């Protein structure tokens, strides 16, 4: 099936790496593996992060124009007519101004992956975007949810409850390292995250606070990532001194190589939906210590693949890291379980099979 693919927050070919870009790329790979033909139909970014109503209005108008151009293209070249529209990551700051219009005009199914709705945004600075997302969800033939916490607010908007389709976050496990036994007296900790203000910086600050309580133990920390909050992140970890190695921004292959050399993934995950880096670490056979925020518990299973700590609790986070570092056998058990769980539940072929079932059930002519 020819599928029009669109990611309003960040297209899969965007030059700046991020979890959103990675997930968009993974969805493209999964759709191809399921036997379909996804085509990126637009790189238009509808994201507006400052609550600027005028800019949001301009983006909405631009989105309408692009949607009309896409429809004109379909009329001119009917051999490229899509049979289904698939949008990834739609929320109030990045509404989908293209998919509902094009899918509705063509009479094809409209599918959204990772849509989220926050009722409080209905009267906030992104109210127009919020209403657009609600409208898109009402039109959707299926909403694929990666985070179970989104379900409660989305279900009331769907035409039927069965249109919510749960899909576990996934990676291509074949690209990550094999399981290995922990080695050496000084465990190698690793954190992988962009350096942005807000939630990412909050996680780095909590990480610095937590690890500063463990200076009586031998360990090292690699930090993979970069961004506009780099100076603030360095200040957050300044008490760790020479124990930290700053790796900067790395490509996918280099990140996989660093994960393969580490012993423990540590990340507070403040206000994160689920965290792709945590899933990559688990695929690499790394146990994790993480904050129990958002959908992180769907990635790190407590006492099975790692430990979860109450959000924002630096002493508890430090205690959890200490306990895993000091117990080599426990760390090895977590590592094996982490890799196995990814292969069984979070691997690309598993996701491709599930997506294939959903799309095949919709068919090219089921849109209401």
Features from the language model and the residues they span:
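Donor nucleotide-sugar binding/catalytic pocket of nucleotide-sugar-dependent glycosyltransferases
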Residues: 134, 138-178, 188-194, 245
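Conserved donor-binding/catalytic core segment of Leloir-type glycosyltransferases
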Residues: 181-202, 208-212, 222
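Nucleotide-activated donor-binding/catalytic signature segment of Leloir-type glycosyltransferases, i.e.
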Residues: 231-253
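Short alpha-helical donor nucleotide-sugar binding micro-motif in glycosyltransferases
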Residues: 249-250, 257-262
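Aromatic "clamp/platform" in nucleotide-sugar-dependent glycosyltransferases that forms part
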Residues: 270
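Short hydrophobic beta-strand element within catalytic cores of glycosyltransferases
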Residues: 287-290
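Conserved acidic donor-binding segment of nucleotide-sugar-dependent glycosyltransferases
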Residues: 302-303, 307-314, 323-329
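A short, well-ordered alpha-helix in the C-terminal region of glycosyltransferases
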Residues: 323, 330-345, 351-357
């Amino acid at each position: 099936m020819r599928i029009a693919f669109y990611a309003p927050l960040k297209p899969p070919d965007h030059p700046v790496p991020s979890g959103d870009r990675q997930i968009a790329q993974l969805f493209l790979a999964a759709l191809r593996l399921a036997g379909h033909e996804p085509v990126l139909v637009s790189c238009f970014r509808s994201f507006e992060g400052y609550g600027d109503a005028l800019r949001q209005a301009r983006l909405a108008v631009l989105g309408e124009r692009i949607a009309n151009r896409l429809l004109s293209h379909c009329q001119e070249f009917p051999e490229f007519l899509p049979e289904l529209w698939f949008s990834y990551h739609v929320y109030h700051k990045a509404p989908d101004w293209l998919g509902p219009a094009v899918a509705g005009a063509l009479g094809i199914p409209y599918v959204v992956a990772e849509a989220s709705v926050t009722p409080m945004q209905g009267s906030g600075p992104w109210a127009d975007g919020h209403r657009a997302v609600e409208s898109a969800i009402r039109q959707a033939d299926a909403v694929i949810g990666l985070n179970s916490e989104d379900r409660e607010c989305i279900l009331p908007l769907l035409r039927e409850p069965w249109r919510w389709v749960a899909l576990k976050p996934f990676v291509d496990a074949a690209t990550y390292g094999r399981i290995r036994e922990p080695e050496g007296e000084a465990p190698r900790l690793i954190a992988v995250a962009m350096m942005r203000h807000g939630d990412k910086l909050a996680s780095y600050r909590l990480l610095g606070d937590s690890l500063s309580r463990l200076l009586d133990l031998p360990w090292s920390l690699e930090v993979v990532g970069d961004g506009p909050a780099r100076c603030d992140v360095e200040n957050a970890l300044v008490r760790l001194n020479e124990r930290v190695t700053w790796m900067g921004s790395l490509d996918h292959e280099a990140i996989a190589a660093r994960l393969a050399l580490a012993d423990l993934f540590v990340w507070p995950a403040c206000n994160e939906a689920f965290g792709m880096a945590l899933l990559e670490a688990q695929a690499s056979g790394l146990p994790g210590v993480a904050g129990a925020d958002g959908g992180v518990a769907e990635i790190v299973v407590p006492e099975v693949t790692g430990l979860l700590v109450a959000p924002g609790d630096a002493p508890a986070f430090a205690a959890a890291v200490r306990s895993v570092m000091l117990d080599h056998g426990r760390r090895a058990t977590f590592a094996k379980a982490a890799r196995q769980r990814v292969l069984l539940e979070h691997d690309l072929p598993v996701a491709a099979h599930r997506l294939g079932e959903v799309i095949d059930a919709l068919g090219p002519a089921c849109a209401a």
